[in-house]
Amino acid sequence: ARRIAAYKVNATWFSCNQEPPETSEFDLVENAHDVVLLAARVDHSPWYRFVLRHADRFLVMARRDSRPSKPFPLTADDGARARKFRLVDLVMLHEGAHSGRTAEWMDAIDAARVINIYNDACVDRLARIISGKSIALVLSGGGARAYAHIGAVKAMREAGAPIDFICGASMGAVVAACVAMGWSQEDMETRIREAFVASNPLGDHVLPVVALTRGGRVEDRLERHFGDALIENLSLPFFCVSSDIVNGTVRIHNRGMLRTALRASIALPGILPPVIDDHALLVDGAVVNNFPTDIMTTLHRGLTIGVDVAREGVIDIEAFRNPPGFFSWIASHGFTAAPPIISLLMRSATARRVSLDMPRPADIMIAPPVPGVELRDWKMYETAVADGYKTTKAAIDENWAALAPIISAAGRKL
């Protein structure tokens, strides 16, 4: 309660197993407070049923060495508003013996995200989430232009803006995963340089049958840097998106092997082979949703910041005017240079669609122009990072009134 109060939120709470108040009495309490916390044990008591009916959001708290009851008494039949709007979070308390039961809990309660409590900073994050003062960050796809996201994260960290929930599509998912792993700015930049800047991650070309590259370089680098990390065990709540081209829908990856989810999210059709998951064929998230602000604003109650680097794509039109044949291209450029078809496929996958159902915008929209950086300009790291930093720093200054109370409370020793 003390941590929530730091965010200037008028909150009250009801303890476990008390007699449910009359509806009119409870309405008065809700109208008089910003946040009303209802604490309950999972049982079949009248109080627990009251909580299920009235809660707008569920925070199911569990120890990592515990098992959920099956079936868990939190189903669509309960008619709970939180279930309707998918606002069910798992708060995993890392106490007791180690176990791998987080995914089991997520399945039991159909959790949208996991809030892991590893240390005191995680408790502060939970306080921001409960008070509606948390900050979520959405990172778009954009190939090498997504390096700008690294500069955006740097600007937010320097300003003291906490990142409490993060997601991304395509290359934006990779940068988001770096943040969710809890890596420092220096560590993140070192790893991105090694994985994508030092040598072309899409350089293992083959004669195209399924794709223009084998995908082996990308898979090796994802395994080297992310190992066997599971999404549900990350320091920050995280998800990324891929596109299921069997049924044309978005796949939300919020649990399971992180590197597998990232491999699906960056599988540009025709460039990287797709990822097969049971009866699904998963390709780059950018194909269906390159900027998943709509998903984030559904799951998140707080301030959402979106960084979109795909608004102003750069592509060399002259490369497609009277293009040479295959052998003429090889004679002029050798086997190491990427042919124009790669730029064409990448741009086709990440081009913004103009439609009536565009994703809901973030509260703060940041669009680094990233001038002169093409989607496959993997060597243009410094230029893209600098532009992302500069644009985000300016956006923070412009939106200081909205950010200052959160930054001030987050930086205060509670």
Question: Which role does the model predict for each range below?
Answer:
Residues 1-22, 29, 171-172:
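Walker A/P-loop phosphate-binding motif and the immediately C-terminal alpha-helix
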Residues 23-35, 40-167, 177-414:
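Patatin-like phospholipase
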